Amino acid sequence: MTKLDKGTVIAAALELLNEVGMDSLTTRKLAERLKVQQPALYWHFQNKRALLDALAEAMLAERHTRSLPEENEDWRVFLKENALSFRTALLSYRDGARIHAGTRPTEPNFGTAETQIRFLCAEGFCPKRAVWALRAVSHYVVGS
């Protein structure tokens, strides 16, 4: 039997997600897939919401290749490329946008967000409008 760790659970959950979709993704089905008892999953994830948050993070880590601006990049180009990359990441898994829409930023993503805001501020945005611009792009891509 393979050692059950967080990465193994996430990989199996992403496979299952593609097969059955978000509404049918249950911890019971995931435990069956992993050949473990359901409580074993709670060692790694407190609840289904925590699992879904981890899935959203994994999708972005795997496929969102333009989350940071390039040196001397125009802010318009960055926002466009960021949106396209974000969209590609969410479309790479069934119900990816729905899963991401229910998440909140987590500590590992704070640095990325701060870099994006600093970049936009250096391009002439005030901090408030930089956040608005990033949120607008995110909401446009996700559809919320």
PLM segments and residue spans:
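N-terminal intrinsically disordered/low-complexity leader segments
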Residues: 1-4, 15, 64, 68-71
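Generic alpha-helical structural context detector
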Residues: 53, 57, 88, 135, ...
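Helix-turn-helix
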Residues: 8, 12, 16-50, 54
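Short, basic, alpha-helical segments at the C-terminal edge of helix-turn-helix-like DNA-binding modules
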Residues: 58-62
